[in-house]
């Protein structure tokens, strides 16, 4: 009987010792889809584009990245070619409607990206026009 208890407790200890990061990207998307947009927001009641990708980096990749689009662009690894983008890469756009002049989202696959789009849309998946990309950054090398 003792052997059975020990056998059961070891897997449970392993499960509870896991960190809360490394959430699969698909699960993260499902959890945040249609969250309202709020400039300066950082949670489910409202989030802006840079806080959204900051949260994604932490929850999916276990990496804490800077809070603003400008500091994110400056601190992350450069992806030189649009053809070498991978799911999870951050894509930055110039934006006249953003206070910083930039917008950021997370590349998914098949020319789609996930982002906190603005007050009317919130967090959505959008088709990507690669011509509109300003720069691409990778969270993990």
Where does each model-flagged region fall?
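Short glycine/proline-centered loop/turn elements that form peptide/ligand docking sites
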Residues: 18, 84, 97-100
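Sec-dependent N-terminal signal peptides
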Residues: 4-15
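Non-catalytic ligand/cofactor/substrate-binding and regulatory segments of enzyme domains
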Residues: 17-34, 135-141
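Catalytic cysteine-centered active-site loop
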Residues: 35-87, 139
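Glycine-rich catalytic cores of cysteine/serine-nucleophile enzymes that process amide/ester linkages
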Residues: 34-47, 93-134
């Amino acid at each position: 009987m003792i052997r059975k208890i020990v056998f059961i407790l070891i897997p449970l200890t392993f499960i509870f010792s896991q960190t809360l990061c490394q959430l699969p990207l698909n699960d993260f998307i499902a959890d945040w889809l249609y969250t309202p947009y709020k400039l300066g927001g950082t949670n489910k009641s409202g989030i802006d584009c840079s806080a959204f990708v900051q949260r994604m980096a932490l929850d999916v990749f276990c990496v804490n990245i800077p809070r603003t689009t400008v500091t994110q662009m400056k601190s992350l690894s450069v992806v030189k070619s649009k053809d070498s983008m991978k799911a999870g890469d951050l894509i930055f756009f110039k934006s006249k409607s953003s206070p910083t002049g930039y917008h950021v989202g997370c590349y998914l696959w098949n020319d789609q990206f996930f982002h906190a789009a603005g007050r009317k849309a919130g967090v959505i998946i959008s088709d990507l026009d690669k011509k509109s990309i300003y720069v691409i950054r990778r969270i993990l090398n």
